Amino acid sequence: MKKIFILGALLFITSIPMVSCTDDDDKDPNFMPPDIVMGGGDVESEYPEDLPVPGASVVYAPSLNANMYRPISVKYSSAYPPISSWKTENTRIIAYMDGYKPAIKTLKAYQESVNKYGSSTTLPKQAATGRFYTKKIDGRWWLVDPEGCLHLERSATSLRKGTSSRNKAAWNSRFGTDEKWLSTTQRELSEIGFHGTGAFCTGTYSLIQIHNASNPSSPLTLAPSFAFLSQFKSEKSYNYPGGSDDNAAGLVFYNGWAEWCDSYLAGSAFADYLRDPNVLGFFSDNEINFSSNSSRILDRFLAINSSNDPAYVAAKGFMDSKGVQSVTDALNNEFAGIVAEKYYKAVKEAVMKVDDKLLYLGTRLHGTPKYMEGVMRAAGKYCDVISINYYSRWSPELTTAIADWEIGRASCRERV
């Protein structure tokens, strides 16, 4: 059975919208929030005094167990300052879940409950293979770390040096050397529960590997990101289909795509990551535009002016095979799945030829594609982990169509 694990974007921190909570005069001076984990060592710290007071207890609708919680009201905006318009939503924090009582209240207790990868040492241990892998246990998919411990990846993306004079001055003042920078970063991140790095650590991946080699008991996991489509375009001297990078996915129909994936994975770009036990896996691209709310991929490819463009030829051939003239959402979903299948298949088959233990984390699906059955089906067929950039939502969605789709021989409901 194909192994898969759904990975939320919250595990790979990327961006935070502008947020404003309740004003000071809205707070109840007599309100006493519950205990939460904040402390260092074996000392429990006080709860921050400036958090907003929650509202009355309500049922959290998506909860399978009808759990109660006390919402806090959050004003947010995706606009850049100065902000003239705010949206308001209720959201949750763990401390305000009714009945929540933390089992671990101190840093010392936390450190005793996890290993060097941040994996649980209290949950049932699995086979230790020396590499990360996925495994389905009692109906739930897990990551298993190289030591055989069940693992929930918690990592920070974009760990890299800034380029401004202010960045450089601050870095030199506090760290001065790469060794101190990464050892300090690893320690400080691990103390708040983050044990790895994600995408976009440009210029830092090799430094992390040097740190890991020198500090085997306190590594940072890696999940390097690549740009397969743009690299393929550049190395083959192609243009984007129709001259637009929105159509980058159409490059999979161009001559040499699968062969190029083979050579790229066997080349210098991947050499340092193959068989490295601290590499969780890799992302081959980021947020591929398989469609958006305002732009369907099938429409875009059919609008390409050149009738010889391989992306246009593929789209036209698809429509001809259906015997139709007009694009529908259903046809677009099916065609997007064909494009995604061609993309993911080539990457996965290339991975298997060089390191069959290296997890393929997909392409950080974002926006419309994560709701498209054809795209998700293709990703589930070839990716070991389906990575989702889950933005613009204050709470998880339970009643999403993904729960009822079939991917491979098991339903998504079994895999989420």
Language-model regions, residue ranges each:
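Sec-dependent bacterial lipoprotein signal peptides
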Residues: 1-19
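Bacterial Sec-dependent N-terminal signal peptides
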Residues: 15-53
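Active-site-adjacent substrate/metal-binding segments within catalytic domains
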Residues: 67-216, 231-278, 330-333, 337-338
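Structural preference for beta-strand elements that scaffold enzyme active sites
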Residues: 196, 219-223, 278-283, 357-361, ...
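Short, solvent-exposed turn/loop segments enriched in Gly/Ser/Thr/Pro and often Arg
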Residues: 198-205, 228, 283-289, 364-368
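Aromatic- and acidic-residue-enriched segments that line the glycan-binding/catalytic groove
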Residues: 209-246, 276-280, 284-321
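Active-site clefts of carbohydrate-active enzymes
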Residues: 234-250, 327-329, 366-367, 372-373, ...
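Glycoside hydrolase catalytic-domain groove-lining segments
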Residues: 334-349, 353-415
